[in-house]
């Protein structure tokens, strides 16, 4: 709530401290720079949720996504200063430990916030305290830049749906590397990658193969 607002917009009329050079490319603290071997992330822009419903007490918004996605949640509110809004996913307690969540402390008046620490799941929970009026909620889907290009069809609906779910599972475990799972173990594991890279040839557009080459 003490942050300088709109400093990154051309309409900003305030003043900022002078820029400081902390290091040159190829030198400390950065080290050698290398060309990124995979595409930049896919970015959907801000999107409306499939549906939004309130809890019985009216203190929580349950915002449905179209599928299990990697997203950054957004809100626009009018609030008193010092109110804490909690944001988490339905996958927050999906493993052995609680995982990714966000908090936003309000300032006085109308304001917007997007939590850039990405999280994933099927539904976003906004827990809203008294003294906060919600004006809008949205989400931004980001992820590895490839398309679900493969297809499968048979006379059994079970296997058709299994294909769709498997392709979505493959995609949700991709970002800067293949990962065990996107909600708690985001490190690359070769055991998982071996399975996933084999699926990528059948399910994804060619750009998906670059993640396996990166290793």
Name the predicted role of every residue range.
Residues 195-206:
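Well-ordered alpha-helical scaffold segments within catalytic/enzyme domains
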Residues 1-183, 191-192, 207-213:
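Extracellular/oxidizing-compartment recognition motifs
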């Amino acid at each position: 709530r003490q942050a300088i607002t709109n400093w990154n917009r051309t309409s900003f009329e305030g003043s900022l401290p002078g820029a400081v050079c902390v290091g040159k490319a190829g030198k400390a603290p950065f080290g050698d720079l290398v060309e990124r071997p995979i595409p930049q992330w896919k970015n959907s822009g801000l999107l409306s949720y499939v549906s939004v419903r309130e809890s019985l007490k009216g203190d929580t918004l349950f915002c449905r996504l179209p599928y299990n996605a990697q997203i950054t949640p957004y809100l626009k509110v009018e609030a008193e200063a010092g109110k804490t809004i909690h944001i988490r996913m339905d996958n927050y307690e999906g493993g052995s430990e609680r995982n990714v969540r966000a908090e936003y402390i309000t300032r006085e008046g109308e304001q917007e916030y997007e939590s850039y620490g990405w999280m994933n799941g099927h539904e976003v929970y906004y827990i809203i305290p008294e003294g906060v009026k919600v004006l809008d909620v949205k989400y931004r889907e980001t992820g590895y830049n490839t398309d679900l290009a493969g297809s499968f069809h048979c006379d059994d609906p079970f296997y058709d749906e299994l294909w769709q779910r498997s392709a979505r599972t493959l995609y949700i475990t991709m970002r800067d590397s293949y990962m065990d799972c996107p909600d708690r173990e985001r490190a690359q594991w070769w055991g998982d990658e071996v399975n996933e890279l084999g699926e990528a040839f059948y399910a994804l557009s060619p750009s998906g193969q670059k993640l396996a080459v990166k290793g």
